[in-house]
Amino acid sequence: MKRLLPLIATLFAIACCAAQNLRKVPLADPFILLYDGVYYAYGTGAGSGIEVWTSRDLSTWERAKGNARDGLALHRTDVWGEKWFWAPEVYRLNDKFYMYFTAEEHICVATSDSPLGPFVQETRQPMIADEKCIDNTLFIDDDGRAYMYFDRFNDGLNIWVVELEDDCTTLKKETMRPCIHVSQEWEKVWPRVNEGCFVIRRNGTYYMTYSANSYESPFYGIGCATADSPLGPWTKYDRNPLLQNPGELVGVGHSALFRDKAGNLKIVFHGHKSKGAIHPREMYITDVRFRSVEGGCRMEIDPGYSPALIAE
């Protein structure tokens, strides 16, 4: 046994070094779609559009060849905007795939027949043409009504909501209203930012995850607010943030919730490359749970995250 110990130690050291050298998926503002047994990850990263990655187990990922130009899922030649393609989310609606994304600090939507694209706009224009907005996300309630949440540039970045028409692209402008703004001490590091939200409904309560502080800050983190209606009013948890600087990670945020093949609720988010470098931001996944508390249930994010690794 004593002779085996040095060998075991050597093998363990080799395994640790190998794990540290595995490359992580370089996606910021990530979103995961599960469709037909395959996970599709979209995010900020490509300069001329939106790339897509695929996985069958959420652990190892491959850069997929998208059907748009240059192997992307969405290319700038098919949509409004020339640059700054950020924060895409993809949903299957009406037998098509809808991608909600930001281009040149304007919120847009494009459609495709495949999760690999090409995502195209028949009419090349943003959803709100006369105002800069970012980070649009879709929520469809149990009654079929669709809502879009997004960030507006007023007194920093604040999160707003608007109901959509049945086509999930046209705004009912009279329903537009604010949801949350910078209000808690942990959010006031720099600058004034509440952004990158995502909304789900559970047992009649609406849960909104969001990120606060600049994405460049090591104190970027994820908070939660709840409401009894998708239009609010929203109340932030008094014990926010739910996730900030877990383990060795810094700059964690811009998350999205999804369910895996077993139906478990998970959250995907990005973190900085390292404590000394922001870019490229990298994708991580962890579990989401609900704990019974006085007056209801509280969302919790497991700090035991897993990196999304590139299959070699």
Sequence positions of predicted segments:
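Carbohydrate-active catalytic/glycan-binding domains of CAZyme proteins
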Residues: 18-312
